[in-house]
């Protein structure tokens, strides 16, 4: 069962933004029994983080966001996504980003050193604590520990929430905060748009996006087209020629539907293929907008 939220001095209060670096380190009791003292600023993350996340619904105003750092276990053959998804409160959007994955030995060694226990200073104590930590992980079939961000958002109006739990290890240039805020805003807007409304959008290509083409010598058409993001999360997207064409003319003047019609006419597509092309561009527009490659324009 999910642990209840811990008592909080902010009980009954709501906020527009919550930022938290809670004690999230997964330090097993056996480690402290082996001689490593509890460090209040970081330890006991196992039961604390799920409770904090579960209680966010009581503290977020409509349109508000909570951002947390956290760890979660990768157990057995199960998915870490299922573990973290079980923490999330109903009715709220959630974007969970796993930024790094460490194996148990790496994880335990890092936090033992952070606590001042190193093999150079006290090899016997270090080995005992490391063994206790690894024994606990093995007993619970923990095969890795993920590090990342938990971003939880209350919709401005009641609607079906969206959930995205993904592994993204790349990074773009600059700070991440504005990118996160834009993604949440775009997703809020797209949640109320059907495909016809998305086709009417006039998107703008983000200024940090570049295109990379791979061609076999002598070939007229590229074998691979990549769109690369310089900011945000530094994502790379493999694009079809149609999606690359959309990105190439996304200057805020033409709608997605107009671009689809123009490409279909130039390619002399029949009605069925033209409809499929339009659907592809609409779907791609949603993805490019929610990852920051495109801005909504109108």
How should these model regions be labeled?
Residues 12, 142, 274-278:
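Generic detection of long, well-ordered alpha-helical segments
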Residues 92-245:
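Rossmann-like AdoMet/SAM-dependent catalytic core
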């Amino acid at each position: 069962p999910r642990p209840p939220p811990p008592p909080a001095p902010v009980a009954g209060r709501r906020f527009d933004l919550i930022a938290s670096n809670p004690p999230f380190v997964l330090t097993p009791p056996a480690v402290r029994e082996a001689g490593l003292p509890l460090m209040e600023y970081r330890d006991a993350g196992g039961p604390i983080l799920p409770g904090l996340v579960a209680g966010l619904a009581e503290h977020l105003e409509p349109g508000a966001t909570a951002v947390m750092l956290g760890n979660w276990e990768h157990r057995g053959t199960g998915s870490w996504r299922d573990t973290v998804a079980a923490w999330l409160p109903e009715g709220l959007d959630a974007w969970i980003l796993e930024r790094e994955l460490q194996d148990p030995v790496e994880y335990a060694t890092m936090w033992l050193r952070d606590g001042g226990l190193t093999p150079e200073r006290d090899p016997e104590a270090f080995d005992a604590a490391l063994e206790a930590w690894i024994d606990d992980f093995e007993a619970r079939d923990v095969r890795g520990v993920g590090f990342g961000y938990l971003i939880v958002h209350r919709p401005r109006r009641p609607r079906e929430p969206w959930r995205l739990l993904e592994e993204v290890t790349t990074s773009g240039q600059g700070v991440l905060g504005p990118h996160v805020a834009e993604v949440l805003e775009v997703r809020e807007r797209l949640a109320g748009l059907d495909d016809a409304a998305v086709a009417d959008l006039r998107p703008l290509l983000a200024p940090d996006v570049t295109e990379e083409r791979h061609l076999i010598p002598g070939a007229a058409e590229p074998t691979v087209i990549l769109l690369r993001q310089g900011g945000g999360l530094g994502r790379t997207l493999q694009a079809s020629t149609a999606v690359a064409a959309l990105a190439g003319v996304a200057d805020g003047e033409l709608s997605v539907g107009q671009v689809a019609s123009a490409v279909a006419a130039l390619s002399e597509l029949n009605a069925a293929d033209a409809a499929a092309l339009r659907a592809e561009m609409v779907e791609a527009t949603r993805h490019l907008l929610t990852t920051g490659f495109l801005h909504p324009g109108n």
